[in-house]
């Protein structure tokens, strides 16, 4: 998008906003003009971003984002310490916690193995994971069902199984409200594999 007709600070704001995931130049322009018309919203947003950058860090145990180290999940007295769920990103922890079903601990990899993008095991938090397995009896792989997610889960399972740790994978299949007609073959196959008695 051509920002030549905009004052430089506005053009910089639009450019900065358009670098955010899912925000194209037109949406960035709309957001920029909104922020200019709502100075208090803009100030609050700027302060929140600066505060998050200053105060949020990775938990030294699970690598999730937190403002306390170790994080409240890792220090939670009611958490099942023999059960560890491995996820790709911090937002995955939030998704799992919303279900109120998982009572164990987490480990955030901050990505997946992706040779095409130059991401190998050493770029992930795998070494920290291997250092915190004492007492863990089961590891639940909760990676996304992508080629990279599957490769990462397979890599980790090969590391963990020789340690005598049970390695499981979350079930994949049709979403609630999904329609078989529109599902791809892999999704249907996974749904069949993950079937259970009712």
UniProtKB/Swiss-Prot annotation:
One of its GO terms (molecular function) is DNA binding. This is Recombination protein RecR. GO terms for biological process: DNA recombination; DNA repair. It comes from the Bacteria. The gene is recR. May play a role in DNA repair. It seems to be involved in an RecBC-independent recombinational process of DNA repair. It may act with RecF and RecO. A zinc finger (C4-type) spans 59-74. It comes from Desulfitobacterium hafniense (strain DSM 10664 / DCB-2). Pfam families: RecR_C, RecR_HhH, RecR_ZnF, Toprim_4. The keyword Ligase does not apply. Residues 82-175 form the Toprim domain. NCBIfam families: recR. PANTHER family: RECOMBINATION PROTEIN RECR. Keywords: DNA damage, DNA recombination, DNA repair, Metal-binding, Zinc, Zinc-finger. The keyword Metal-binding applies. Belongs to the RecR family.
